[in-house]
Amino acid sequence: MTKVNIVIIDDHQLFREGVKRILDFEPTFEVVAEGDDGDEAARIVEHYHPDVVIMDINMPNVNGVEATKQLVELYPESKVIILSIHDDENYVTHALKTGARGYLLKEMDADTLIEAVKVVAEGGSYLHPKVTHNLVNEFRRLATSGVSAHPQHEVYPEIRRPLHILTRRECEVLQMLADGKSNRGIGESLFISEKTVKNHVSNILQKMNVNDRTQAVVVAIKNGWVEMR
């Protein structure tokens, strides 16, 4: 079984140790190194070439966003997940623009952390459910006010195929993604396993011709396929 090699960069030792402890419980994960500032991140990644870097956004010297930008340019094979206490849209979009593949709030639970690392390691993107919900609400607010959320270009692809290509279960999962639920939360609500939820999400992304969960939700809202609750 191939291991997912992980580096943790966070200037708070207790939090860093807590994250490592959670990841150590997952047999397919291996934390290969830790660091406590953004300036150190590049040296660590150059040496270990991890699959995933978990990066705190607020650190002395070089902050997490600047460190992420540097890592993406120098070591694009190492995918970065940002850790933050901020759920504001500006923080999230700034982090994603630098090339981060994930954005987690530090209030996350263990299941969300593990799920995010798995998704990002497999080449996907992951946003904390609360962040997804906030971004969707902001997009909806801009849409209803007649202001374009992306005036320069269309970020989210238009759907050329009708929604009825989704099964009823996939429609239920799509609605719960819009509600900001994690895979675990969806599974508990529908009484199905997290693995089954992941399969449904993968099918939804493929059928909707989008890259990640956030795009799927935003496109669904634009087309009136889900309710904002």
Curated annotation (Swiss-Prot):
Principal place where this protein is found?
cytoplasm
Q: What is the effect of changing V131L?
A: Increases phosphorylation
Record-annotated Response regulatory domain positions = 5-121
How would you summarize its activity regulation?
Phosphorylated and unphosphorylated forms are both active and have different functions. A low concentration of phospho-DegU is sufficient to activate transcription of flagellar genes, but a higher concentration of phospho-DegU is required for transcription of other genes. Phosphorylated DegU is stabilized by DegR.
Q: Which residues form the signal peptide?
A: none
State where the protein is found. Answer: Cytoplasm
Maturation and modification: Phosphorylated and dephosphorylated by DegS.
**Molecular function (GO) terms listed?**
DNA binding
Q: What is this protein called?
A: Transcriptional regulatory protein DegU
